[in-house]
């Protein structure tokens, strides 16, 4: 099977590649990858090349396919897997394999990654339960289940303690104060959505950022009134220019501090602020992955000793986290499409990945069977003045107030003749 992929050939070297995939073994799957949402972790891998812990050597001869937030359709089933999978079945990939090597789809494999028209899912990924049946029909939601899974996993990874009781209570503190720092970006939107609509029931959620435009957008998507209707106080704060943001933020809790803090940017000042905002037994989750292997900040160990403050770090999520993300999206409790601001085809991947931090907006969603430059949803109407494809896409997203939706996805895929398979039974 001939495939077209975006692959890492070295540091800051991402190219399109067309080649013949080998025949699958009896324990592998050949799949068509319909959609993949671009993760900042992919940019980090492209930036570092083989110096990244998950990226192997010899990229020049064996380039690795980018992308891991993907969903698609099974095209061919290995002989030993016919009782478990079938041709035409839709799937979503859970890429966190937890291997000692750190290897996973989108970083480490020549034939296994989300930015591909076709890829081979290897036996090891299948045995680890990474291929999940997808019962829905909206591939964007399936792709976005992976970033939502990471967000959900972070909430589950936090923990709290009782003095002299040597058991961790996993998850955020019920009825507690949550602070989401540097959290008005695409992943932050998902974190706010889950805090309000994920059923974890904090009493207060404070979202902190320094970008007015981003804060204004997320407030439209997730207004304070929505949170209030669920018994949650939601506060948006821009700390840019504040002389003492710590004092102001602690005042929102009566100076008690925050029980759970999530840091969504690998910026020393943000991590230090999080430390100062912790309540007694407060848990700081360092969600943002730094590219600097020597990333260090001061931390108050007096509070560690006397106030039981503590730190966790999370990367990825479990299969159960993924299933939760899919289920909450299917019921409409979570709206992962809120994160999406740009749509593009496979041809847009190299430039998108290499310039990802400099492209404004939220998640960039790629449809591999589509030829289309990366385009902001907000620009559809203007482009539609001269291009009938964008004219119809603009009309369809207008029905959901500028948010990407399943009808727009189906129209786009139909224009390029993409086979969307059938829902898992």
From Swiss-Prot:
To K.pneumoniae SorE. GO terms for molecular function: oxidoreductase activity. It comes from Escherichia coli (strain K12). CDD domains: sorbose_phosphate_red (cd08238). This is Uncharacterized protein YggP. Keywords: Oxidoreductase. Gene3D superfamilies: Medium-chain alcohol dehydrogenases, catalytic domain, NAD(P)-binding Rossmann-like Domain. It comes from the Bacteria. InterPro entries: ADH-like_C (IPR013149), ADH-like_N (IPR013154), GroES-like_sf (IPR011032), NAD(P)-bd_dom_sf (IPR036291), Zn_alcohol_dh (IPR050129). SUPFAM superfamilies: GroES-like, NAD(P)-binding Rossmann-fold domains.
